[in-house]
Amino acid sequence: LANNYLFVYMDYIANTTCDLADSYSKLANEARERYWGRPLSRIIHHRHPPPVDVYPNAIPDTRTNICFLGQVREDSGLDLILPLLPELHRDIGAKLKIIGPSLSVERLRIEETVESLGLKNFVELYDFLPLSELEEVMKDCFCGINLITNEKSYSSFATPGKFIQYLQMKMPILATKNNGIVDVIEENNLGVIIEPSASLILSSVRKLYKDQKNYTTSILKYAKEHPYLSIKEYLKMVEDGE
């Protein structure tokens, strides 16, 4: 409900009351203009492809774990990867780290699923963490996942914040096509885009693990080509009315 309805109106208020809209997703902007029948922003800066500022402490050496960062939803796809964890742990030593709000209905359901399937040895659960702790928890993960299964989700138009966080930690992305930067991921070798099926998840995780150093190289190259703008640069854009 919040994602597909309430967010639309929050998005409207944000875009119509700000001097500058900083858009990470051209698909989201196109969907916004279709929905309201007109452009909403006075000035819009398109950050597509989105910039990445790699964390200096991100560890580039071989890693073994998988990360899911953010709000667990019904369509997050965690139910697809959970049954695969014993095999992945046996093959490459992988565990799944779930980091995000711990009291939502879906998060609690996932925790119950972990318990009922006997997966406690293969899953680590965390609440939202301060940035310093987040880096420490994520640094041994070789990929970040976003396996959205609902093509009608508003998230299908967006660039999930978790994607930027993954790339900042030099982690390639394993995602379904239900996001706003499929082209960026594929064209820049930043991860793997798949259909939401268990067999594809299994083979793709193995590929990302095997080729993680090549993906790290691609991420560093991308970050160099797409740096963040400074606050001064944004303020100048507002002043100039660009």
Regions found by a protein language model. Name each.
Residues 50, 57-85, 97:
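Conserved donor-binding/catalytic core segment of Leloir-type glycosyltransferases
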Residues 196-198, 209-241:
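A charged, aromatic-enriched C-terminal amphipathic alpha-helix characteristic of glycosyltransferases
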Residues 100, 108-136, 143:
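Nucleotide-activated donor-binding/catalytic signature segment of Leloir-type glycosyltransferases, i.e.
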Residues 4-43, 52:
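A short, active-site helix/loop in glycosyltransferases that binds the activated sugar's phosphate group
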Residues 137-156, 171:
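Acidic donor-binding loop of glycosyltransferase active sites
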